[in-house]
Regions:
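Bacterial N-terminal signal peptides that target proteins for export
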Residues: 2-15
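C-terminal motif of bacterial Sec signal peptides marking the signal peptidase cleavage site
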Residues: 21-24
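Extracellularly exposed regions in secreted/surface proteins, prominently low-complexity, repeat-rich
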Residues: 181-225, 257-261, 265-269, 286, ...
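Exposed beta-strand-loop-beta-strand "reactive/processing" segments of non-cytosolic proteins
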Residues: 87-114, 171-190, 221-245, 301-324
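Long, acidic/polar, low-complexity amphipathic helices and coiled-coil-like
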Residues: 97-111, 115-206
Length: 339
């Protein structure tokens, strides 16, 4: 699934999503690119600032193209230099998208008049190519901020994870304001997401201590007060947190092999908040193992203060059987009830 398919899905999840990237097959030149401690605070993706195009920035004129730019090694080994030159040809303007395959690199920039312009490198030549990308307010970025030099390693990771066909590294807005790197393929098989530091996003399970710890850490991020947190195989890991703005709930989700994403909604929950330091992933994992009918059975876990006690309570719904524990994993179903 391409980043654009995920973008459509995410916009059904997110409230108030306002940006979209309409990309077909991308620019064409030759072959077109396709498009048990408690969790500690860790940074989560934040919207990427979009630099404004300089009103005086002018790309290299078409009459000076094609431009010779030979490289001594393969494109993948020379990707940083090639992308840097493509960006120079584009006058250093804010970038909407970068595609890199083994044979071609393409960069699409945002012009001061809000139109877009694409340049491609192939076989030692840089040319202006047509693009079907439209600017609808999506985030722009500077390619120098992303580890283009790691493209070989990212391709190797994608291959190990079963991405088959011609591999394509894309740097592009994935959700509103969030620019991510992905490796997908042509023909499309699957997609591997990479963080800005070049590390691959793993698919987390919902029963082991390691996976539960990682999932809770990612959705807590730098948060200090939770309205609720939980996970299940359908929704993934999620957390509702306080926001800097009063009357707003910050929601974070981490589903499958997709990075954490954030949404905000206007709400003042009646439930009290609690500290993420109270969470004990090992105790949650042990409770799941105790309540599962079979080792492969999934449970829907929710932790919040909705039961009116002095500390948060964990609720486990395993195939319709509901149990409750405190944060140490002690069963308290008889104290809380069966709701």
């Amino acid at each position: 699934m391409t980043p654009y398919t995920w973008a459509m899905i995410s916009r059904r999840w997110a409230v108030g999503a306002a940006a979209a990237l309409l990309v077909g097959c991308g620019p064409t030149q030759g072959q077109p690119p396709v498009s048990t401690p408690s969790p500690s605070a860790s940074p989560s993706p934040t919207p990427t600032p979009s630099p404004s195009p300089s009103p005086t920035a002018t790309p290299v004129p078409d009459d000076q193209l094609p431009l010779d730019f030979p490289v001594a090694d393969s494109l993948l080994d020379s990707a940083p230099a090639v992308v840097e030159e493509l960006h120079r040809v584009a006058a250093g303007l804010p970038v909407l998208k970068v595609d890199i395959t083994a044979q071609q690199a393409t960069l699409t920039a945002l012009l001061p008049d809000k139109s877009v312009r694409s340049y491609a490198w192939r076989d030692g030549l840089i040319t202006h190519v047509d693009s079907d990308i439209q600017y609808l307010g999506q985030a722009t970025f500077d390619p120098a901020d992303y580890p283009i030099s790691s493209v070989n390693r990212m391709f190797a990771v994608a291959d190990l994870r079963g991405v088959r066909g011609e591999l394509v590294l894309q740097v592009v807005e994935y959700r509103e304001g969030q620019v991510l790197m992905t490796v997908t393929s042509r023909p499309e098989t699957s997609t591997v997401f990479f963080r800005k530091d070049g590390t691959a996003v793993t698919t987390l399970g919902y029963t082991s201590v390691a996976d539960i710890t990682a999932g809770l850490e990612e959705v807590v991020g730098d948060g200090t007060a939770l309205y609720g947190i939980g996970f299940n195989p359908t929704r993934g890991y999620w957390a509702d947190l306080t926001d800097d703005e009063p009357g707003v709930v910050l929601s974070r989700s981490r589903v499958g092999g997709v990075p954490v994403f954030e949404t905000r909604r206007s709400e003042t929950p009646a439930v009290a908040t609690f500290s993420p330091d109270l969470l004990q992933p090992a105790a949650i994992a042990q409770a799941i193992a105790r309540y599962q009918a079979t080792p492969d059975q999934s449970c829907d876990v929710t932790v919040d203060m909705s039961h009116g006690r002095f500390a948060p309570v964990a609720r486990y719904d395993c195939a319709g059987t509901v149990r409750f524990t405190d944060m140490a994993g002690r069963d308290m179903t008889d104290l809380v009830g069966s709701g």
